[in-house]
Amino acid sequence: MKVTIYTDGAARGNPDGPGGYGTILSYIDSTGVEHIREYSGGYKKTTNNRMELMAAIVGLEALTKPCVVTLYSDSQYVVKAFNEHWLDGWIKKGWKRGKNEPVKNVDLWKRLLAAKNQHDVTFCWVKGHDGHPQNERCDVLATTAADGGNLADDNVVE
């Protein structure tokens, strides 16, 4: 099955404020009917990068069988990690980067890799806040979640 996932993350007062993620999952079933699902969640204290990662994780974890996925994100952090093979280098170096510095958000990178594992995923960058309807909707989902009253604890903020 072919699936399209759109994602966005947001943080207020990055890195010490609340944040949220928004995800849209879209697919067309065997009868030609399009199905769209939306996901969002908010955290009390987090970072924008963590919310960008969570948006991708939630979309991939929602899939119940192996799929061919096109995942759109306005986060170059997420897209370049895969398309420019940053992750391969980080893993080879024991989750270190550059000057032997630890990679941030390792907990979420590992979770994203596990969620991606059973799928054929293509990561595509889309310019944020540029009128792309699904990206704009994900932004609304993310910011609404960040501003909501039912925020979870993000136990690892780096």
UniProtKB/Swiss-Prot annotation:
It is found in: Cytoplasm. Mg(2+) 2 binds at residues 8, 139. It comes from the Bacteria. It holds the Pfam family RNase_H. Its EC number is 3.1.26.4. Endonuclease that specifically degrades the RNA of RNA-DNA hybrids. Monomer. This is Ribonuclease H. It comes from Lachnoclostridium phytofermentans (strain ATCC 700394 / DSM 18823 / ISDg) (Clostridium phytofermentans).
